[in-house]
Amino acid sequence: MENCMIRNTGYFLTIFFLAFISFAVTCSGTNQKDNVDRLPVVYEDVRIGLVVDMGSMEGKLVTTSISMALSDFYHVNNGYRTRVSVLSRDSHGDPLQALAAAMDLLQTEQVEALVGGQSLLEAKNLAELGEKTKVPVISSFQVPSSLSLAKYNYFIQATHDTSSEAKGIAALFSNFDWRTAVLIYEDDDDWRESIQPLVGHFQQNAIHIEYKAEFSVSSNEECIMKQLRKFKASGIRIFVAHISERIANRLFPCARRLGMMEEGYAWILTARSMNNFQDTNYLAKEEMEGVIGFKSYIPLTEELHNFTLRWKRSLRLEEVVTRMSVCSIWAHDIAWSLARAAEVAKLPGLSVYDLLEAIPESAKHKGLSGDIKFIDKKFISDKFEIVNMIGRGERSVGLWNSGSFISNRRRRLSSTKALETIIWPGGSTRIPKIRSLKEKRHGKKKKLRVLVPAGNITPQILEVKTDFKTGVTAATGYCIDVFETSILPFNYEVEYIPWPGAINYKNYNDLVYTLYSQKDKYDAAVGDITITDNRSLYVDFTLPFTDMGLAVVTAKDKSMWIIFKPLTLSLWLTIASFFILTGAIVWLIERHDNADFQGSCFQQIGTLLCFGFSTLVFAHRERLQHNMSRFVVIVWIFAVLILTSNYTATLTSVMTVQQIRGLKSNENIGFFSASIAANVVNDNPTFQGPRYKGLKTADDFTNALRNGTISFIVDEVPYVKLFVAKHPSEFVIVETESVTNGFGFAFQKGSPLVQKVSREIEKLRRTEKLKAIENWWFQRQTTSATSEDTFHPLTVYTFRGLFMITGVSFAFALIVYLIPWNREQRQVVLKHFHRYVSHRFAREIRPSPTTPNRQNENSVI
């Protein structure tokens, strides 16, 4: 029993000892693991350079937003091997200092990406630097999407879709039936370039920009008031403003003092303007009551709310900002995309320059600004909120999205014409209407300032005279008559302003550019202005009121051999051959029984030829006795009748058109050296080959055609018609080519008169009043031989069917005639052959008895 207890005690001691050893080892391993866990983790640093104006509110907001965004990102993704660190530099708002700061970051800090570009020039400089150093440059500021930036492969931009915004503003105008507006924008490259999409969509939707005004940051109140008084006097009530907050804080108080923030007016602000506004100037906000603005749409989410609260707490007390700007929200999303891209780019096997390629894939996430779209190196925001400024705040009245719906709770402008109620300036809810003050003056005509080229050398087309005593300019001519007839229904008083430089094609380009660049001085241009593609970039043209294209003129042909021109030589020879063949066949049939076809050899040849050619005038005197000869003559007379009728018709055409000749490569062609024809003949393949000579006046044309120096004249159709009308007996229009677009009236881009005048021109053409005006000034209808009227001689191929029928008929007559003759001749030949064979056979059997005697005589001799 005692031994058993001793054994059990030893057993338990052994187990206890082993358990103790195991526990000690376990504790030792745990301590080692804890020591390992407490070792510092090494992250790979990815340096990003930030170049902003630290003194600007926007620069401060973006810097704070990026810092907080990276902190939040790595708090959520603490397992990432990389950490993005931001190294900031102050650009002080100077593009050159921004470039120097970026170069310093690249050289001293070896940053792998740059964030910055608060202006267009600054963005271009950084983009050029990034292109040379192969470092991505990202801009979260609202720099316009310029074509000059699109060429940089390493430049990435966060921006709103200006094209979608322009469509939205144009749709807003259509919704309220507005067709004219005043465009106010900031006099700066950034703002000037970013307004171009809106101008283009206004033109496409026939919305006329009545006036444009540029205000710079240095513009004082006196300058602004002067422009606003001009707009108020014009009667235009709809304004579109594309300006920064600094200019807006001066513009709207001035507008209110002039009574332009009262009922009947409408002000629309673009997205770039609204996105940059901060809630710092409450008095300026109150001055903007009733304004409508487009803003980049930022969805109200819990994440945005929480981030905004923490962001406000991070600001210093002196920085009073109630909400984040759009740029700072975009900067937050860009920071998250950069952090994701840095992790992907630093994976084993990838180079440091793969950061650019990793950004598009890393941008596919939902940020504070909503679903991020990365299209063509741009973070695109294409959703816009339409807000109405009320008091010190703003109220959403609708959404604009060129794609799909954003929310079912709000109305979308693209799906319905009804927005929520808008409080317009003056507290009115009635939609402002376009009513020009000039239209309110009962019976008084509106003035239309029209440029006319004073140096025209063709008074029938346009002539400008100025009375130096009164200073009044009068214009007459075909172009003026058409214009005044077209503009008559619209109650305009036309003031003609002479343009002294219009003496050649290039100066006409200058005339068009003057109309484009001096919109406050001129409304339209009238004259012999050819519609061209490059001119259409600057002005809007009406429908052409003249024939389109160039015309070719030549002298009328007065050759004495013109009677032979209707038929080709081969056809003349073929007809002559058939005349002789007809006489020969008739002679062959009639010569045995008809005494008229008998006689000596020369008499028979003369009869054969006279009979054949006399069928041309149906005057043959010989009486025919055989039916086959009569058949031959009837068929040939039928053919002659067809040939003579076609010859007569063709000769008539020849005498009318006067043998119009085609252009040959060895003939000289003249053109007016100062007209558009000088450009066209050198560029168009239709006129390649001939030698061209530039002439200066109509007298030069006349003399050159008369003495043969040139064979043809090429010029625009109206000039050619006028030239031929002066010399109808000498010259004729040969051909026309539609290589120019004719003359048109030029108006300012977007002018509503373009469509109205075009409709009147079409009405004049349909009622033939346009033709009557042309005939009045050109004296008579010009004879024109177009390509359809140009003479083409008749050929053998034209009458191949007729000659085939005639030939078959002649062959048939010969065969019928020769069958009985062959029978008689065959009998005679057989008879003679039989006699010859019989005689020959008899001589071989019975020799003649006289043969031996003759042989003996020969031997004796």
Curated annotation (Swiss-Prot):
Q: How would you describe this protein's topology in the membrane?
A: Multi-pass membrane protein
Please provide one cellular component term from the Gene Ontology annotations of this protein.
Answer: plasma membrane
Signal peptide stretch: 1-29
- Give the UniProt tissue specificity note: Expressed predominantly in roots and siliques.
Q: Which residues lie on this side of the membrane: Extracellular?
A: 30-568, 652-800
Pfam family membership, one: SBP_bac_3
Q: Name one GO molecular function term.
A: monoatomic cation channel activity
Q: Which InterPro entries match?
A: ANF_lig-bd_rcpt, GABAb_receptor_plant_PBP1, Ionotropic_Glu_rcpt, Iontro_rcpt_C, Iontropic_Glu_rcpt_pln, Peripla_BP_I, Solute-binding_3/MltF_N
Residues glycosylated per entry: 306, 534, 707
Q: Give the Cytoplasmic membrane side ranges.
A: 590-598, 620-630, 822-861
Q: Main site of residence?
A: membrane
Give the UniProt record's GO annotations in the biological process aspect: calcium ion transport; calcium-mediated signaling; cellular response to amino acid stimulus; intracellular monoatomic cation homeostasis
**Where in the cell does this protein reside?**
Membrane
Keywords carried by this UniProt record = Glycoprotein, Ion channel, Ion transport, Ligand-gated ion channel, Membrane, Receptor, Signal, Transmembrane, Transmembrane helix, Transport
Q: Does the keyword Cell inner membrane apply?
A: no
Concerning its family, UniProt says: Belongs to the glutamate-gated ion channel (TC 1.A.10.1) family.
- How does this protein assemble? May form heteromers.
Role description: Glutamate-gated receptor that probably acts as a non-selective cation channel. Can transport calcium ions. May be involved in light-signal transduction and calcium homeostasis via the regulation of calcium influx into cells.
* Protein name in the entry: Glutamate receptor 1.4
